[in-house]
């Protein structure tokens, strides 16, 4: 029986949607048990005097009745409910909150914009991999939060009174997706961002992370259209032009954009375009979590790990009883190989980190069965929650693990969008060779292998004199590997030193 003392819930009464996250604490991390989201569009119920309409209140209360049933099983001290921009603004917020608290049976805290920004940053820091120095952007329904920080520590926190619902009502109320409406929406957003831009740029960032429905929608569009996962200004401009071509909000059709997200997509896109231009952002990645995760981790008082991906990999190794010595052996070989060919194959630090992760969990499929272990590994990685890894990075890991041995599925390597297909293919080749050379599972059996690569993807494996004759089983595996790689036009040549 699941102990209720291990359960935690976080509820966010946002301007566009109400969200509930229910988790269980497991070995210093969290396991998601439920995510419930309902579009309430509370901000659309505000009039010119900031009075919240009774209809909007009813939509909110109806949603909270759904949430309240799940909360009955969780200790009150382990539930946190916060309200954001619209309920900060509404002059009759107390009327809504009084009934809402009766429905939920627990207090609701209306948090300031700065506190919202801090919680968002905290959620990102606990769930998102990559460099420590970051800029976090969260476009909500009624406000937009911008935060810079390093590691667990937020440095500058800003909350701006603009959101995808308020910008929809202000600039797209006629449902016209013309150039003029977009320009007005963008210009107004740029004027909001401009005063704080110098302070944000002064702190600087190594990575920009987006933690909102707008960014999630962009990610879904890019995956559907086979683009890589990084959001750039040129991609945003392309999507803006596509929206303008559609003409009307009711006729907005972009491959990968769901009907649920379509209504507030143009307004959110306008705000994001303004932020990119005012701050000079080169690219943005999707965050692993935000406000609700910040609330949960705040209740758990768990420290922010320096490397979230390493924590995730360690948890997988423990959970699936992986041979960590063998994983490290394969990883070190792969790192050595990638170092030898990094100049010719242009393998940067990001590529090497993802290859390292794949090596450390490459045997996870054995926990299901030896037969079809690579397919089992890919299935597990596709469907497990992997904090610190983006959806595209998860897909790449699954693809590499599925192609770690036997025949090579070239289309699968082209379908992932974390890295260019050619780069993913090169990582796959290195992983396969590292697994073969480490197959005896002992350090003293690893040969001094040298790799030589060229730009035409010809790869030469140079072995010590007489090694192939002395190691017939691995020699046979390498010969078979040469055939498999050559079959997909990856020339692999085996040589012995003279």
UniProtKB/Swiss-Prot annotation:
GO BP term (any one): guanosine tetraphosphate biosynthetic process
Gene: gppA
Phosphoprotein listed as a keyword: no
Disulfide-linked positions: none
GO MF annotations, alphabetized: exopolyphosphatase activity; guanosine-5'-triphosphate,3'-diphosphate diphosphatase activity
Official protein name in the record: Guanosine-5'-triphosphate,3'-diphosphate pyrophosphatase
Annotated EC: 3.6.1.40
Keyword terms of this UniProt record: Hydrolase
Chain's role: Catalyzes the conversion of pppGpp to ppGpp. Guanosine pentaphosphate (pppGpp) is a cytoplasmic signaling molecule which together with ppGpp controls the 'stringent response', an adaptive process that allows bacteria to respond to amino acid starvation, resulting in the coordinated regulation of numerous cellular activities.
Swiss-Prot/TrEMBL catalytic activity: guanosine 3'-diphosphate 5'-triphosphate + H2O = guanosine 3',5'-bis(diphosphate) + phosphate + H(+)
NCBIfam families: exo_poly_only, PRK11031.1
Domain of life (superkingdom): Bacteria
Family that this chain belongs to: Belongs to the GppA/Ppx family. GppA subfamily.
Biological pathway: Purine metabolism; ppGpp biosynthesis; ppGpp from GTP: step 2/2
């Amino acid at each position: 029986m699941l102990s209720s003392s291990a359960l935690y819930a976080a509820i966010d009464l946002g301007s566009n949607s109400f969200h509930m996250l229910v988790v269980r604490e497991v070995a210093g991390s969290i396991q998601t048990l439920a995510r419930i989201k309902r579009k309430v569009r509370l901000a659309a119920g505000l009039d010119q005097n900031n009075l919240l309409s009774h209809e909007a209140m009813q939509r909110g209360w109806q949603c909270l009745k759904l949430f309240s049933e799940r909360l009955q099983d969780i200790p009150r001290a382990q539930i946190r409910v916060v309200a954001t921009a619209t309920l900060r603004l509404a002059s009759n917020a107390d009327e809504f909150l009084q009934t809402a608290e009766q429905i939920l049976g627990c207090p609701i805290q209306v948090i300031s914009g700065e506190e919202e920004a801090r919680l968002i940053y905290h959620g990102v820091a606990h769930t998102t991999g990559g460099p420590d120095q970051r800029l976090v952007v969260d476009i909500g329904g009624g406000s937009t939060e911008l935060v810079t920080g390093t590691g667990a520590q937020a440095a500058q926190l800003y909350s701006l009174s603009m959101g995808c619902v308020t910008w929809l009502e202000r600039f797209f109320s006629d449902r016209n997706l013309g150039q003029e409406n977009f320009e007005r929406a963008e210009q107004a957003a740029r004027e909001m961002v401009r005063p704080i831009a110098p302070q944000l740029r002064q702190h600087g960032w190594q990575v920009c992370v987006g933690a909102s429905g707008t960014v999630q929608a962009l990610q879904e569009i890019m995956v559907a259209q086979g683009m890589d996962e990084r959001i750039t200004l040129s991609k945003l401009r392309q999507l803006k032009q596509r929206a303008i071509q559609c003409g009307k909000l009711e006729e907005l059709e972009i491959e990968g954009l769901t009907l649920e997200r379509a209504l507030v997509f143009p307004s959110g896109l306008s705000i994001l375009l303004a932020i990119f231009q005012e701050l000079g952002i080169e690219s943005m990645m999707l965050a692993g979590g935000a406000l609700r995760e910040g609330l949960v981790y705040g209740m758990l008082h768990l420290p922010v790990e320096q490397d979230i991906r390493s924590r995730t990999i360690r948890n997988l190794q423990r959970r699936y009883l992986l041979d960590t010595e063998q994983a490290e052996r394969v990883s070190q070989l792969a790192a050595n190989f990638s170092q030898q060919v990094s100049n010719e194959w242009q393998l940067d630090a990001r590529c090497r980190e993802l290859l390292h992760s794949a090596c450390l969990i490459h045997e996870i499929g054995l926990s299901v069965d030896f037969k079809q272990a690579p397919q089992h590994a890919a299935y597990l990685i596709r469907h497990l929650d992997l904090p610190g890894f983006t959806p595209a990075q998860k897909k790449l890991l699954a693809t590499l693990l599925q192609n770690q041995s036997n025949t090579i599925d070239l289309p699968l390597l082209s379908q992932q969008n974390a890295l260019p297909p050619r780069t993913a293919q090169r990582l796959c080749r290195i992983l396969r060779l590292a697994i073969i050379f480490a197959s005896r599972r002992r350090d003293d059996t690893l040969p001094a292998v040298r790799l030589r690569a060229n730009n035409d993807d010809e790869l030469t494996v140079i072995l010590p004199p007489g090694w192939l004759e002395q190691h017939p089983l691995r020699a046979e595996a390498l010969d078979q590997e040469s055939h498999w790689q050559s079959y997909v036009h990856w020339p692999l040549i085996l040589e012995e030193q003279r």
